[in-house]
Amino acid sequence: MSFILRLKLSAMMFLQFMLVASFWVQLSTYLNNMKIEGIMFSLVMSTMAIGSIFSPLVGMFADRVANSEKVLFVLNLLVAIFLTGAFFSTDPTLIFVCLLLAMCAYMPTWGLTSSIAITNSTAEAFPTIRVFGSLGWVSAAIFSIVASQYFNKTIDGTAIPLACGAAIAFISAVFALTLPATPPQSKGQKMSLSDALGLGAFSMLKDRNVCVFMACVVLWTVAFTIYWMYGSFLQDLGVKNITPVLNVGQISELLFMVLIPVSIKFIGFKKTMAFGIFAMLVRYLFSAFAQDVPNLYWGAIVVHGIIFGFFFVVAQMYIGKKAPKEIQAQAQGLYFFFYGIAQIVATFFSTFLIENIKKTPEVAKSLGCVVADTAASLAKTDWTSVFYNEAGITAFLLFFILVFFKDDVKD
């Protein structure tokens, strides 16, 4: 693989993840400030999950009909248009519709960019390319930092990050046209109805270990999804500049991403993913005690690199190893399909926990909050109990993968 090709694939990942990080990390805070609550809050936060469900269909299109880089161009252009619409919208329903359309176009790009990178490089080189996605995520904090340092303004919790996302989406669309031609692997082959619907990769579920793997993906997503609402947790703790704070997790992701090939080589896929799950258990235990020992939330954020890299990214590598070459894009789409279904359930579940497990103001004050004035806010949610629930799910997942999943592919 040439240096120029590696550079292009790395830049693709950088832009694609900078795009979503620029607005999604602080979206829950923005919705809170807009007084969007209850079912509408859950619907908006589930748009990422709903978008993931379309991944197999887009994967089919890339596998059989059109070049992957051209599909990526169209999708990113649509994202730019719909995020612009969300930026100018003040009505909750319009915000939901615009974000739903934006995420339906955006989420399939996770599997698509992975497929482009793996097709044009190697599975072994993928982590060193994918790490630039983490770097892009971290770099999204530049908008908050510039606004704060040079304009003395706070953009977290406003609509401005949506405009930032739209701008990056447009740049990503243009850049997609410079990527190496990635023609459909199965073009010209006979296509069945299931292929037309992007369901070809579902045949992989005949493999018992793939079924167990997908069950792990579902459970992991159910436990992980509350992290997308971590901004609300930090806001209740009185933390300022939420996006840069959360980006500490992405910095750790950069460090651990480069260790993925080493981990897989020495301990295999199963133990690597199990270690990522264990790190998530540590996150929720730290988070549960953060109201008593505030600085623990830093530990909960720092382990994000292990959680995301050692499970989410390694899981993509595993399904890539298991999938036949002719359905690589659909296989990545299958992964994100299950991820999306689970995230929809998890979003409503997490919202239910946050809105229904409450603590009285008196108990909140007795905790000795980071900022005394936030005691009333902490009364809204008993975050300790919320994170105990998440820790319980994670502990079960750790047991499940260690007992039922088999390490059936070689590095």
Show the residue positions of the predicted features.
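Juxtamembrane intracellular "pre-TM" segments in multi-pass secondary transporters
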Residues: 1-3, 179-215
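Helix-loop boundary and gating motifs at the non-cytosolic
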Residues: 2-52, 209-245
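Hydrophobic core of transmembrane alpha-helices in multi-pass small-molecule transporters
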Residues: 14, 82, 92-109, 218, ...
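Central cavity-lining transmembrane alpha-helices of secondary-active solute carriers
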Residues: 43-60, 247-259
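Helix-to-loop junctions at the C-terminal end of transmembrane segments
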Residues: 54-67, 148, 256-269, 354
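Structural signature of the two symmetry-related core transmembrane helices
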Residues: 70-84, 271-286
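Cytoplasmic helix-loop-helix junction between adjacent transmembrane helices
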Residues: 100-132
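A membrane-interface helix-boundary motif in multi-pass transporters
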Residues: 148-167, 352-394
